[in-house]
């Protein structure tokens, strides 16, 4: 079994960071890289418990999947603005993963984001031969994740500013 944990801090309160992960409006930007995307198969309840998603992500090409991995994930233990858990079945290498994401408020309207994941290939031979290499490959893109979250925060700030300007009486412009 492999375990990966990492954290970083973002210049935004947990409520805004939460939106980057959970906002599902039709205007939500989609990644330009077709190897990375998430399809919501079932939205879960009002706060997201029971959400089921199908994820696509880059994997080493030597796995024989043309460089694209897939996972089917079920989210539980959702605590809005705080944390959630996921259980996943993924391929190639047919595996199970359990992960948690935690948002912790820190000083100056900032948030510490912590990801923890445990990953295990089902097949004991594949586990010995490939599990560690595959997990290391998937876990080394922390900078990419941080850049995506910062981009998501910028997009949500622009979206909120635009919505505020669209509501009469909320603009800073002089009224006539």
What do these predicted ranges mean?
Residues 2, 51-53, 111:
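Short beta-strand micro-motifs in enzyme catalytic cores
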């Amino acid at each position: 079994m492999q375990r990966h944990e990492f954290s970083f801090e973002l210049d935004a309160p947990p409520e805004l960071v939460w939106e980057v992960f959970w906002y599902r409006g039709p205007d939500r930007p989609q990644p330009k890289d077709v190897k990375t995307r998430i399809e919501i198969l079932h939205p879960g309840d009002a706060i997201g418990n029971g959400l089921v998603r199908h994820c696509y992500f880059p994997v080493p090409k030597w796995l024989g999947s043309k460089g694209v991995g897939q996972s089917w994930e079920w989210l539980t233990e959702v605590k809005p603005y705080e944390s959630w858990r996921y259980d996943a079945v993924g391929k190639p290498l047919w595996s199970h993963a359990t992960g948690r994401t935690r948002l912790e408020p820190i000083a100056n309207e900032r948030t510490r984001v912590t990801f923890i994941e445990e990953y295990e290939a089902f097949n004991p031979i594949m586990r010995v031969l490939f599990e560690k290499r595959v997990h290391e490959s998937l876990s080394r893109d922390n900078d990419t994740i941080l850049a995506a979250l910062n981009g998501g925060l910028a997009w949500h700030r622009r979206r909120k500013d635009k919505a505020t300007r669209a509501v009469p009486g909320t603009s800073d412009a002089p009224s006539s």
